[in-house]
Amino acid sequence: MTNLTLALDAMSGDFGPRVTVPAALQALASNPRLKLLLVGIPDIISPMLVNSDTELLSRLQLVPAERVVANDAKPSQAIRNSRGTSMRIALDLVKSGEAQACISAGNTGVLMGLSKLMLKSIEGIERPALMTVLPNLKQRQTVVLDLGANVNCDSRMLVQFAIMGSVMAEEVVGVVNPAVALLNIGTEESKGLDNIREAATILKRIPTINYIGYLEGDELLTGKSDVLVCDGFAGNVTLKTMEGAIRVILSLLKSSDGQKKKFSWLLRIVKKWLQKRMTKRFGHLNPDQYNGACLLGLYGIVIKSHGAANEHAFKAAIEQAVQAVERQVPDRIAARLETALPKSD
């Protein structure tokens, strides 16, 4: 694939262009095939590009927008009044075929609502799901979905998520015959809500899915499964809890001790050595390195970045979009659904 064009909602996120513009330039510098359509308010963005490398600027196009979707906007109202916003225009570029993917750090509810409104759903998918790829303790990666797009999911939706997650594990992560599990409150078959148990029964009957059973929340990072499926409520709470805990641990490892005078010189050396070892061992779990949730189930690629993402994290979201485009994820999901998805009555 030679043409690789992405649309960036440059006004989105807690920090807006202060993060998205530098991240865009970094992404361009690391990928010579990449072209970016930077959607935003010209008067704000143009001054930030004045001293940029001319070669990078030749692969960057500023697409004017008039307004920004507020982070605290109510989705229904914001969607009705979305014309002229950077988010809507970025999605329009995907819909028209001018861009192959959209990346935004904006209001999650509005982004999901607009995406479903403007981009066609893949046949056989009732509702799209938010998915991310997490590193695990086996130095591999686990596909996790749904992360908040759907609070209530019936068994059929969970099965659809499992199929989409399996495709992602194969095509993006590169896992052969990925192991698929359902997030539950126990590993026994009798545990959990009816929708989870019903989904398990269906998944066992699909020959193209390597279903291995239930996993509990404390096994998210163990690498026992390549795909972990759950409803959006459980997934969002689990992800946010895990990210918060990891950030606290990493900050403690990097922080200086305020009581250094009480340590002997030998203990200080040992402490620094331990910090380096632990950071090297667990640094790959830093949430900034896997920022970006892909909205699966649409004929179009949409990546949702954390609103509080820094430059490094937003660049990671751009790179995730590149991977999804290169692997032609929507087409591969559609092809798998034709053969794997149980037909509805």
Curated annotation (Swiss-Prot):
<dbReference type="GO" id="GO:0008654">
    <property type="term" value="P:phospholipid biosynthetic process"/>
</dbReference>
<keyword id="KW-0594">Phospholipid biosynthesis</keyword>
<dbReference type="GO" id="GO:0005737">
    <property type="term" value="C:cytoplasm"/>
</dbReference>
<keyword id="KW-0963">Cytoplasm</keyword>
<comment type="subunit">
    <text>Homodimer. Probably interacts with PlsY.</text>
</comment>
<keyword id="KW-0444">Lipid biosynthesis</keyword>
<comment type="function">
    <text>Catalyzes the reversible formation of acyl-phosphate (acyl-PO(4)) from acyl-[acyl-carrier-protein] (acyl-ACP). This enzyme utilizes acyl-ACP as fatty acyl donor, but not acyl-CoA.</text>
</comment>
<comment type="pathway">
    <text>Lipid metabolism; phospholipid metabolism.</text>
</comment>
<dbReference type="InterPro" id="IPR003664">
    <property type="entry name" value="FA_synthesis"/>
</dbReference>
<dbReference type="GO" id="GO:0043811">
    <property type="term" value="F:phosphate:acyl-[acyl carrier protein] acyltransferase activity"/>
</dbReference>
<protein>
    <recommendedName>
        <fullName>Phosphate acyltransferase</fullName>
        <ecNumber>2.3.1.274</ecNumber>
    </recommendedName>
</protein>
<comment type="similarity">
    <text>Belongs to the PlsX family.</text>
</comment>
<keyword id="KW-0808">Transferase</keyword>
<dbReference type="Pfam" id="PF02504">
    <property type="entry name" value="FA_synthesis"/>
</dbReference>
<dbReference type="InterPro" id="IPR012281">
    <property type="entry name" value="Phospholipid_synth_PlsX-like"/>
</dbReference>
<keyword id="KW-1208">Phospholipid metabolism</keyword>
<keyword id="KW-0443">Lipid metabolism</keyword>
<dbReference type="GO" id="GO:0006633">
    <property type="term" value="P:fatty acid biosynthetic process"/>
</dbReference>
